[in-house]
Amino acid sequence: ESSGYSWSQNSIRDYHSPINNYVGKSMITISNCVNDLEKRGFKKKNIFILGFSQGAIFSLWFIIKQKYSLGGCISIAGGFDKKVEFISENLSLESKQTPILLMHGEKDKIIPPKESKNTYDIFLNLGFNVELFLYSTGHKIPLKAKKIIWNFLINQTNNLT
């Protein structure tokens, strides 16, 4: 696997550093998207966020910081390298109703799968509805992931009625 490309060299790991403006701008962009969807008539419980790699980490960070819950968050090949204390210190309790699907390749050499496993344990201990699926690929999304994502979306939307 190659190291790939990031649209920003600043990651969520840099959140508390002087270069955190990229992370902050990303959070504002996601928030603006949610607000725009609401203005168009979507309810928050019908809005889902999906992120891959760096986007997965940003989507998880966005979820825990919100004063509301969304329909769900799908994080593919990205997770926190943080300890539970860091997450709980930054957690908004209102966000805990957002279901989370974590997916990660067990052969990922770019973002270690242990980060998704760590994220799963943290979110589970904090009371989130969280699922973790590991698959035998590297830093990519296998075709079989489509069915898992589809089932997650269907299950969450069925829970809304």
Language-model regions, residue ranges each:
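C-terminal catalytic histidine-bearing segment of alpha/beta-hydrolase fold enzymes
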Residues: 101, 114-161
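Active-site signature of alpha/beta-hydrolase-fold catalytic machinery across serine-
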Residues: 61-65
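Serine-hydrolase catalytic machinery in alpha/beta-hydrolase-like enzymes
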Residues: 1-46
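Short beta-strand/loop motif that positions the catalytic acidic residue
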Residues: 101-104, 108
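Gly/Ala-rich beta-loop-alpha elbow adjacent to hydrolase catalytic centers
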Residues: 50-55, 59
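Short beta-strand immediately N-terminal to the catalytic nucleophile in serine-hydrolase-like folds
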Residues: 49-51, 76, 103
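A conserved short beta-strand
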Residues: 68-81
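Flexible "cap/lid" loop of the alpha/beta hydrolase fold
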Residues: 4-13, 79-99
